[in-house]
A protein has these predicted regions:
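Bacterial Sec-dependent N-terminal signal peptides
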Residues: 2-42, 213, 245, 485
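Aromatic-residue-lined binding/catalytic grooves and analogous aromatic/hydrophobic interfacial grooves
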Residues: 20, 238, 243-291, 308-309, ...
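Short coil/turn linking the two alpha-helices of tandem helical-hairpin repeats
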Residues: 157-164, 228, 250-261, 492
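Membrane-proximal, proline-rich intrinsically disordered regions
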Residues: 19-72, 275, 333, 342-345, ...
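Conserved, well-structured interaction surfaces
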Residues: 86-163, 200, 204-209, 218-230, ...
Length: 624
C-alpha cells in the first residue's frame, strides 16, 4: 500500500480506480473486525470511526493520536486547563506555553496532519457514491461522510485561522506575518480536487470554507433524515442540528472579519433555533451527578447515560490506539497506571476558577481539594484536615510531612467540604496520595486541584488493555442548552438568557441564580459555567478563540507548575494558532508565503522565574 502525507500534497489524492485498494491505509490504526468487513465501501465508512480512535503518520512524525486527545491538546492553551505535575512528561507543553512555531512545532503540526487525514478518508467515500443513483445504505453512508467532513473543516478552519492580537503588550512584540492573513482559512480539498490542484492550493477565505461546511450540513441533513443510528458513533439528524448551532455561533461571532457572512442577527436566531431542535430531536438529557461521578463509567461510556449526542470509541482490540502516549485515558487519567505522560503531568483546574466555583455545585468534586492530601489515617472527627500544624496553627511544611509511604494514608477517609462528601474514586485515596507527591514532581503540592473527571473504561485503572479503551463525546446535549442561552442573549435580552442559563446550571447547583443585568455580566457568568462544564472536552479551546477570551493563568497564587505556563493575555492569544508544517509548505507553494507567524511569549510572561511564582503557592487570592 502507498503511504500518503496530507491533503495538500499531490500524493494524497489517489485515483478513483484505486480507492477500493486504499480503503485501509497503512498509516491508520484499524480494528481487525472492521478491516474484515465484507463490503469495501462500508469498510471505508467504518474506518472513519477507527481513524478517529487512532491516527498516525510516521513520515510526518505524527504518533498515534485520537480525536479526543487532539482536542484536549488544543485545550492546553486555555485558562481552565493547568498542568501541576512534572513538566518533563508534558507532551502537550508547547500548547500549554503558547510556543507553537510558525513552521509547526512537533505538536503544532498535529492539527493539519490529523484533520486532512480525516478529510481524505471521507473524500474517498464521497467520490465513490453517486447521489443521483444510490441505495438507502449508500444514502446513509453519504450523509455520514458529509456530516463528518463538516465537523472536520469546521474545527480545522477555527484552529488555523490567524487572529491578530488585541492585547497591547502582545501587539508591541508581534512578529508580523509575511502577508495579510485576515479572513484566510485553509486550503479546500474535496473529492473533486486533483493532484495538480492540491499542489498549488491557496488558503481559501474563511467564508469559502463555511460555504463548504454549510453545504455539507445541508446534504447530511437531507440524507440522514429518517435514519436512526444504531450507535452514537454515527451522526444523527439531531447531531447535524447541533453542528448547525455551533457553526452559526461562530459565524455570528466573526461578522466584523467576514467578507460574506455579515447577518449577525439572523445567525444568532439560527443558533437558538438549531440548538432547540437538537435538544428536542436528540431526546437527550443532561448528565446527573451520579452519572458524572460514576467511577466505572464516568466520561468513558457512550451508552451509560443519555447526555451524549455523538461520540467516538476505541475498542479493546485496537491495540495501537490503546497503547499510545496520546491515548485520552492515559493523558487525562490521574488514577491510571498506564503512562507517566498522564498521571505525572497532573491535568488540573485553574485555582482561581476552582475557588470561584460554589461548593454547592457537584461538578466541583471533579477536582481534588488541597485538604484531600492532608487527611492521614490518624484523622480525628471534627478536626482540621491537617497532618501537622506549627505553634501558630499554620500548616507546617518544614518536615516534608506529605511525602509519606502509601501505607500511612487511609483508604476510607476521604472528605470534601463541610458536608463531608466522599469523592467517588476509581482507585483509592491512599493510591492517589501515594503518587501525587512532591517527589513525583508536584512542586505546588497540595495546591493542584487535580482532576478525577475522566475515568478509565470499566473503572480498570491498572490495565491499559481494558482501561484505555474509552469512548469520548463529540457532542453533549448540555452544549446545546448553553448555546441556546447565548443566542437568547443576542435575540431576546439578558432576562431570557439568564433564565436559560439558570435552567442548565441548576441541574448542577440547585441554588444557582444568574443575577446579570448587562450583556457583559451575563457573558462573564456564561463563560465561567461553560468552561467548568466542558473542562477537558475540547469545547473550551474553540470558545476561547471564538469569543477571544484570552488566557489568564498568570496571577499571584496560581497553581501552574512553572512560570512559562502562567500567561496573562487579554483578547486573542497567539498560542491558539499553529503554523503549517514544513512538508505542507514545500508541497503546496500557494501557502508558502501565507503562513501563520510566531511570536515568542517569553516577552510577556507574568512571572520572570519559577522562584517568584512558586513563592505564592497557597496564598490567598486577590480578587478584583
Amino acid at each position: 500500500m502507498k503511504k500518503y502525507h496530507i491533503a495538500l500534497a499531490a500524493s494524497l489524492m489517489l485515483g478513483f480506480s484505486s480507492c477500493i485498494d486504499e480503503t485501509l491505509p497503512s498509516d491508520y490504526v484499524l480494528d481487525s473486525q472492521i478491516a474484515a468487513s465484507e463490503s469495501a465501501v462500508q469498510g471505508m465508512v467504518n474506518s472513519i470511526y477507527t481513524t478517529m480512535a487512532g491516527y498516525s503518520n510516521s513520515d510526518g512524525g505524527i504518533e498515534v493520536i485520537s480525536y479526543g486527545s487532539m482536542r484536549v491538546q488544543l485545550e492546553h492553551g486555555t485558562t481552565p486547563m493547568v498542568t501541576t505535575g512534572y513538566n518533563g512528561y508534558n507532551t502537550m507543553g508547547n500548547w500549554h506555553y503558547g510556543t507553537i512555531p510558525a513552521t509547526g512545532s512537533n505538536r503544532g503540526i498535529y492539527p493539519s496532519y490529523l484533520y486532512y487525514g480525516y478529510i481524505k478518508n471521507v473524500n474517498d467515500i464521497i467520490g465513490l457514491i453517486d447521489p443521483e443513483n444510490m441505495t438507502e445504505s449508500q444514502k446513509t453512508n453519504l450523509g455520514i461522510c458529509h456530516a463528518y467532513r463538516a465537523l472536520y473543516y469546521f474545527e480545522l478552519v477555527q484552529i488555523m485561522e490567524y487572529k491578530y492580537p488585541t492585547d497591547p503588550k502582545v501587539k508591541a512584540v508581534l512578529v508580523q506575518p509575511e502577508n495579510d492573513l485576515t479572513n484566510l482559512g485553509v486550503p479546500i480539498v474535496t473529492e473533486k480536487t486533483t493532484s495538480e490542484e492540491a499542489s498549488n492550493n491557496p488558503r481559501a477565505t474563511v467564508d469559502e470554507v463555511y460555504d463548504l461546511i454549510l453545504s455539507d450540513l445541508a446534504k447530511a441533513e437531507e440524507y440522514l433524515t429518517g435514519f436512526t443510528p444504531s450507535d452514537l458513533i454515527q451522526p444523527s439528524v439531531a447531531a447535524i442540528y447541533g453542528l448547525y448551532a455551533r457553526v452559526y455561533s461562530t459565524l455570528a461571532s466573526r461578522v466584523k472579519t467576514a467578507a460574506k457572512y455579515k447577518d449577525e442577527a439572523t445567525y444568532w436566531q439560527n443558533v437558538y433555533n438549531y440548538a432547540d431542535k437538537a435538544i428536542t430531536a436528540s431526546g437527550c438529557t443532561p448528565l446527573t451527578e451520579d452519572q458524572w461521578h460514576d467511577p466505572i463509567n464516568g466520561f468513558n461510556n457512550r451508552t451509560s447515560q443519555n447526555s451524549w449526542m455523538w461520540a467516538t470509541t476505541i475498542s479493546q482490540s485496537n491495540s495501537p490506539a490503546i497503547s499510545s502516549g496520546f491515548n485520552f485515558a492515559m493523558i487525562m487519567g490521574t488514577e491510571t497506571t498506564f503512562s507517566v505522560y498522564g498521571w505525572r503531568v497532573g491535568r488540573s483546574l485553574d485555582r482561581r476558577m476552582y475557588e470561584q466555583l460554589s461548593d454547592n455545585d457537584w461538578r466541583k468534586k471533579s477536582w481534588l481539594h488541597p485538604s484531600f492530601f492532608y487527611q492521614s489515617k490518624d484523622q480525628k472527627e471534627g478536626e482540621p484536615y491537617l497532618v501537622k500544624t506549627d505553634a501558630d496553627g499554620n500548616w507546617d511544611f518544614s518536615d516534608n510531612v506529605w511525602a509519606k509511604a502509601d501505607g500511612s494514608w487511609s483508604n476510607d477517609f476521604n472528605s470534601f467540604n463541610e458536608n463531608r462528601y466522599d469523592y467517588k474514586l476509581t482507585s483509592s485515596a491512599s493510591w492517589i496520595r501515594g503518587r501525587i507527591t512532591k517527589g513525583n514532581g508536584y512542586v505546588g503540592w497540595p495546591w493542584m486541584y487535580i482532576n478525577i473527571k475522566f475515568r478509565p473504561a470499566g473503572g480498570v485503572y491498572d490495565d491499559r488493555n481494558i482501561g484505555a479503551a474509552t469512548d469520548y463525546p463529540i457532542m453533549r446535549v448540555e452544549e446545546m442548552h448553553f448555546l441556546k442561552a447565548e443566542a437568547a442573549l443576542l435575540t431576546q435580552g439578558v432576562d431570557a438568557a439568564s433564565g436559560l442559563l439558570e435552567d442548565i446550571v441548576k441541574t448542577r447547583n440547585s441554588e444557582y441564580t444568574c443575577d446579570a443585568t448587562t450583556e457583559e455580566e451575563f457573558m462573564k457568568q456564561y463563560n465561567f459555567q461553560k468552561q467548568v462544564e466542558f473542562w477537558g472536552e475540547g469545547v473550551n479551546y474553540f470558545d476561547a478563540k471564538r469569543l477571544e477570551l484570552g488566557i489568564h493563568r498568570g496571577y499571584f497564587g496560581t497553581n501552574c507548575e512553572r512560570y512559562q505556563q502562567a500567561l496573562d493575555v487579554d483578547g486573542v492569544h497567539l498560542g491558539w494558532t499553529p503554523g503549517w508544517n514544513q512538508a505542507e509548505l514545500n508541497a503546496n507553494q500557494a501557502i508558502y508565503h501565507y503562513n501563520n507567524s510566531y511570536t515568542n511569549p517569553s516577552t510577556y510572561y507574568f512571572y520572570k522565574s519559577n522562584d517568584e511564582m512558586r513563592a505564592n503557592y497557597g496564598k490567598d487570592l486577590i480578587w478584583e
